[in-house]
Amino acid sequence: LQPTSATQPAYGSEEYIAAARELIEKCKKAGLQVALCDDVDSDERHPSGRAGGLFVAEYPQYRAKRLSMIEYICTTGEHVERPIRKTGMLMSVCAYEVDTGETLDLREFVVGDTIVWDVPAGNWNVLQFICEDDDESDCADYLSYDASLAFLTYTYKRLLGEGDPDAVAMTVSLGIAYQTSNRRQWSPDFNRVFKKEFGFDPEPLYPALFFDVGPNTTRYTALLINCRAKMLTEGFFRALNDFTRARGIISTASLAEPKTTAAPWLFGDGMAHHK
């Protein structure tokens, strides 16, 4: 079952749920197997991977998060007093020298909710990196195990109610990825997971996601994105595995295309998933 925006009754409506339940039951009686497909498409043709927006409307705490950068352009000798953005969690605060790529960790200059810093000579910018809700996305936070499990439980129960789980033989997940603005999906837990995985603090590395910070730029970005790929694996895909195994259902999924290890034209995260 792979509903689209053209499906009638409209996906997520009570009429759709009733029709889907009836279809599943008839397939079971006929000896046919049913696969539920959660698909996400950027042009909203496939609403099931987002539960049609119904899930995050009911559970806003599980909405996808994005990484936002707030940049303040400084002048040499300026006494900076800039408020910390309060719309999300502060992940990193740094200074970036535009001409040389040098970065400075400014955490010691955060006083309360304000960055207080005297700008040295050079062409410096102050950068805040904030993990905040992506109000433009109605996807679940796929980097979170709890959010992913809640999403799967929500969509499954809406279709089957308290019915026999044997009615469904397989779930298929397509397009589950970084469904936020410019694919900047992030997690408030990122720094903690990174430090546990690699043994050091990632906060000074954040500017490398947006700028050239010198010869280590590629290494830093690889470490950061590898951690995000791990969180996706330990988030949605582990939740999917646990959810379906507990119900005796087969789960399957696919990366954007199966040859990502041979021709990674799209994203390096695919190689981590294959690993």
State where each predicted segment sits.
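N-terminal-proximal low-complexity accessory segments that begin disordered
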Residues: 1-9, 15
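Short hydrophobic alpha-helical runs that function as membrane-insertion/retention elements
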Residues: 1-2, 34-36, 253
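Carboxylate/His-rich catalytic cores and anion/metal-binding grooves
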Residues: 168-202, 240, 245-275
